Amino acid sequence: MPTISVGRDRLFAALGESYTQEKFEELCFSFGIELDDVTTEKAIIRKEKHIDEEADDDEEIIYKIEIPANRPDLLCLEGLAQSLRVFIEKQEIPTYTLADISKDKILQMNVKPETSKIRPFVVCAVLRGVTFDEARYNSFIDLQDKLHQNICRRRSLVAIGTHDLDTLQGPFTYEALPPTDINFVPLKQTKSFRADELIEFYKSDMKLKKFLHIIENSPVFPVLYDSKRTVLSLPPIINGAHSAITLQTKNVFIECTATDLTKAKIVLNTMVTTFSEFCARKFEIEPVEVTYDDGKSYIYPDLAVYDMEVPLSFITDSIGVSLKVEQVTSLLTRMQLQAEQAKSSDNQCAIKVHVPPSRSDVLHPCDVMEDVAIAYGFNNIPTRKPASIKPLTLNELTDLLRIEIAMCVYTEVVTWLLCSHKENFAMLNREDVNSAVIVGNPRSADFEAMRRALMPGLLKTVGHNNKYPKPIKIFEISDVVMLDESKDVGASNRRHLAALYCGATSGFELIHGLVDRIMEVMAIPFLTIHENNVPINEKDGYYVKLSQEPEFLPGRQASIIVRGKHIGNFGIVHPEVLNNFDIPDPCSYLELDIEAIL
C-alpha cells in the first residue's frame, strides 16, 4: 500500500487538535489507515546517505502513514486532514460545484484525431484563486507524484500536467506530432529541445528515464499547445517551463492525458476535490470543454454525485451487528457519504447513499458496508463463529492425515513452494520437458521455479541436518504446481503427501508400511493380484506394482494404484540423487497425490 509522509505539526494544525502518538495511532486505526513510522526529514536524508549523526531537538517530526491503495483522495496531507475532520465530526461533508460559466467563455480543449495512435484521451479543469504557501505547494506536487506511482501506473495509464493559466492563452489543442516537429523549453531547463533530442537527454535522468519507454518508440508524440503554439507539456514525460506553477500562481490549469478514460476522470477529480478547498470560492471548480474530432464534446471534471441503494439487512448481516437506519446514516456521514432511508416499494428497508466525486473507491454495496464497519469500529464488532462454517473436504483430509502420520513418529516439515530449476529436474535425475511453472524475473537462482514435487524440499531438509542422529523421519503435506492449459492462469495446485526415511539402512519396508497405514485409515482395501498381474475388482481398492522412475533405485520402487488410477510412487532413493543433495545415508521416499484419491 502507498505511504505518505506528512509533517506532524501541520497535520495537527489542519485537524485543529493535537494528539499524543498513541492517541493518533488509535485515530488512524479507527479510520482504517496505519501510522507506519515516526521520523524526521533530516533523519530520512541521513538514512539515504548513510550518515551517522545525532538528531537535533528542533527537527520537524514526520509521520509516515500507510494509505489503502483504493483511496487516492488520502494521498496528501490536505486530503487526509479533510477526511479525518469529517470522520471526527469537526467538518461537514464538502459539496463540490462547477463554476457557472457561459458557453462562450468556457475554456476549450480541442483533440486532434492523431492522438488516437498513442494516448487518445484528455480531461481538464481549472482551479481559480488558489492560495499556495510553500508547504501546500510541495503537497500539490507530491500528490501528483503519488497518483503517478499508484493509480496512474507510473504514468502509463494517466499523466498529469499542472500549469499557471495566467501564462497561457486558450483555446488549447491536444495533438500527436512527429518528435522532430516538437520544440520547447522543458521544465527546469533554459534551452529549447526537439522532442527526440529530449528523449536522449533524459535517458541519464534518474527520475524521468523510467517513463521514456512509454512513447519513445512511437512515430508520433502527444503534445499540448495553447492558441499561441506554446507547449504546455509533452506527456507523459515533462511539462513546459513556460507555464510552470510557482508560489505566486493563482489560477491552475490541470490536464490529464490518458489511455484509460475512467482512470483519468478519477485522477482529475482527486486533484480538484482535494485542492479546491483553497480556491477563492471554496470547493468550486471551473470546467473545461473537451471537443474531439468527431464533433462530440464533454465537460470536465464530472462532479456528479451518484446514488446507490443498499439494503439495511445486507449491511447489518455482513458486519454481524444490529443497527438502525439512523445509526447507519450517521456512520456513513463520518466516512464522507451522505445517506438517508430510501423509499422502497416493498417492505425491505434500504439506505440511499450519495457517493461524492472524491470517493472513487465506492463501487458496490460491499464498499458501503465496509465504510459502515470502519466507522462502527472493527474492535466493537462481536466475534462469532459463522453458522455456515465447514472445512473443505481436501483440507479436512489433510489435517487427519497429518495427525495419523505424526502418530507414526514422523516429524512434519514445511518447505518452500519455490525451488531452483536444477532441483526440479537434474538433481532428481529427471529430464526437463518444459513442464514446470517458471518465475519470470527471479531474484535468486534458488527460487526460479515452482516445485513439481515435494521431494527436493525434503531431501534438502535432510541434507542440511546430517549432523543429527539417525534415523530421520520427516513428512510434508502441501501443494505442488503443475502446468494446466484448462485453467485461465495456465497452472493449477495439487495437494501432495510426501514422507522420507533416512537411516543406516534404506527403510524401504517402513515406507511401504506407511503406505499401507495411509490406505488403511482411508478405508481403501488392498487388492489381491492374480498370476497375470491383474487385480481383482481394480476399482474397489489399491495395489502396488513395479515402476521405473529415475529418482528411485531400479527394482526397488513401486507405483501406487488406487481405484485403477496412478496416484504416486515410493521406493529407495537413487544414490546419485542422494549425492546431489549431500546425503551420505540411504533413504526411502514416498509421494502421492491426495486429490487423486478424493
UniProtKB/Swiss-Prot annotation:
GO terms for biological process: phenylalanyl-tRNA aminoacylation. Mg(2+) binds at residues 361, 367, 370-371. Tetramer of two alpha and two beta subunits. It catalyses: tRNA(Phe) + L-phenylalanine + ATP = L-phenylalanyl-tRNA(Phe) + AMP + diphosphate + H(+). It comes from Arabidopsis thaliana (Mouse-ear cress). Its cofactor is Mg(2+). InterPro entries: aa-tRNA-synth_II/BPL/LPL, B3/B4_tRNA-bd, DNA-bd_dom_put_sf, Phe-tRNA-ligase_IIc_bsu, Phe-tRNA-synth_IIc_bsu_arc_euk, Phe-tRNA_synthase-like_B3/B4, PheRS_beta_core, PhetRS_B1. This is Phenylalanine--tRNA ligase beta subunit, cytoplasmic. It comes from the Eukaryota. Pfam families: B3_4, B5, PhetRS_B1, tRNA_synthFbeta. Its EC number is 6.1.1.20. GO terms for cellular component: cytosol; mitochondrion. CDD domains: PheRS_beta_core. It is found in: Cytoplasm, Cytosol.
